[in-house]
Amino acid sequence: MLPLDRRRSFCINLRMRFCFIAPCLVLFALFSWAKIRDPFTNPFDNPVDDPDLPRVLIIGDSISIGYTPRVRKLLQDKANVHRPSTNCRWSAFGKENIDEWIGESKWDLIHFNFGLWDWYGWEQEQKATPASYAKNLDGIVRKLKKTQARLAFAVTTPPCLGPERKAKIVVSEARANEFNKAAIQVMINHGVFRNDLYSLVVKNRVKYQRGENDVHYTEEGRELLAKQVADFIGKVLNK
């Protein structure tokens, strides 16, 4: 057993170390929380609303997940930009879940897309057709219109040049255009604004996509998409 004076010294040193370490741990925890909770880096971290700004909802797959934080940054002090805390996947999945994503909140503008999952058939037992895709989109738009928000459809970004890494198939430009034409007709029928992201990048896929087997975008590609989305949202809000 340690002598009394050494035990006292040990306890004092222990308390001093704790008093030094504890604030550091608190600061580290706060810094980590703040980093994780940054809406400009985390797409699923929706901002605390400024009541003086319009509310915007972005609905879409991983392409929109990639550009959402950048859109928030570009529209900072202009709009409260939200999105569902999930990948919104394909059109039939969207039709089933759209009410949950809209929620009970008031939206001034909803910018939405479904497409790539329908083209490639990821996680789907039944292969989509332009007709089934259009039918699902029509159902989605009818539900969105009930919010009385302005609606903007993002025309689906292009397929990758080679066999997609998961589906192992090539989606031709002809197939992509069939689906996009079907979507555009639905939007025309309902008077929905259209943001043509397809034309923005189709001729520069080698530059902006991650690879010939990947539909996703490099940082430069995400910045390009985000700028067009932010500009488009700003224009529609000002109409």
Q: Model regions: which residues?
A:
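Alpha-helical cap/lid subdomain in secreted, periplasmic
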Residues: 49, 74-80, 93-239
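Extracellular interaction modules
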Residues: 21
